[in-house]
Amino acid sequence: MSDPVVVPRAIVAGHGDFANGLISAVEVITGRRGVLVAVSGRDLSGSNIENLIRRTVEETGVRVVFTDLQAGSCTMSARRVFRDTADAVLIAGVNLPMLIDFVFADQVPAPEAARRAFERGRSAMCVIGEGK
């Protein structure tokens, strides 16, 4: 029996190996591979990052991008790619709980799952200790 075909649902983009590292952790924790596609901005100009994100969106058909920094080059590039795409969602400041939630929400349309995952990711952050 063959494994079920997994269709990518989102891109994770960031500096260095950020995207690959996060995706690796998500796959280890969830056991689900192929749901997220990594884009690294390492050694690329803003226009090259934009072209890479655009090409990945065209090849996969995804309408969700998670990025590392709100004002980072990957976020700015994804904003330009999705400028005229009404059904697209871009979430900056991605974290591990957010992506785990997104990956498990496979019965929900990806844009809606991304919005829900954003709330989960935000609520998963906490400060422990007083730091005195």
Where are these regions (language model features)?
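N-terminal loops that bind phosphate or other acidic moieties
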Residues: 1-132
